[in-house]
């Protein structure tokens, strides 16, 4: 059994590196794998606050910035987070961090960690590409908000959390174009590919370990959003 998890940078490092969370997250994963050592997990790390701080700084330094430059900066932040998570998952993670899901790579351990890839592609997109590569029909997206909302909850007090949504309706919310540093519930390009692949996605606040454990145990009584075709 394989689980593919997008671990948002805002979960790893909301204001500072979330050491206790990473320990608890590791404990949950180790427990799940030790129940059946054939189980495997792929973790794709986002850049989060670190990426946005560097990107925002660069935009101020060079107002004539190009989006590819911003993406390259953000990708490096995902790689830093990936190294931290990869090393934290020893001894069940023994393979090198993957930065290109289109290439062949080793997956000898129980846990594989991946980072950002190249300009124009978010870690959401990479998560969906891993699902395609391994013929998995579902993914888990761990973010720092409880659910997907019908509009930005940081801007609108009347934003409503959605327990279920289709990929088509999500596309209407997130739009069709990806911009570096975007703080969307899911990357628009990844949304389009996920619809094509008929994926099921669980989106939830990764900081709530007990809630995440419900998803691991296939208990649909969790706080979050399920995305389906």
Predicted regions and their residues:
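C-terminal catalytic "cap/lid" subdomain
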Residues: 1-229
């Amino acid at each position: 059994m394989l689980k593919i998890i997008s671990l948002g940078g805002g979960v790893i490092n909301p204001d500072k590196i979330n050491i206790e969370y990473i320990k608890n997250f590791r404990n949950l994963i180790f427990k799940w794998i030790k129940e059946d050592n054939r189980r495997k997990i792929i973790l794709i790390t986002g850049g989060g606050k670190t990426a946005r701080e560097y990107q925002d700084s660069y935009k101020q330094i060079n107002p004539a910035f190009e989006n590819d430059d911003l993406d390259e900066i953000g990708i490096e932040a995902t790689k830093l987070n990936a190294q931290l998570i990869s090393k934290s998952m020893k001894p069940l993670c023994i393979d090198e961090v993957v930065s290109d899901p289109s290439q062949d790579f080793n997956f000898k351990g129980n846990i594989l960690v991946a980072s950002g890839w190249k300009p124009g592609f978010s870690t959401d997109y990479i998560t969906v590409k891993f699902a395609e590569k391994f013929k998995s029909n579902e993914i888990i997206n761990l973010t720092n908000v409880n659910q997907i909302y019908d509009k930005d909850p940081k801007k609108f007090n009347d934003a409503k959390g959605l327990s279920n949504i289709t990929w088509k309706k999500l596309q209407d919310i997130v739009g069709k174009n990806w911009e570096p540093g975007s703080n969307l519930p899911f990357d628009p390009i990844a949304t389009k590919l996920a619809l094509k692949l008929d994926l099921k996605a669980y989106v939830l606040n990764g900081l709530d370990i007990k809630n995440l454990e419900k998803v691991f145990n296939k208990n649909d009584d969790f706080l979050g959003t399920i995305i389906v075709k």
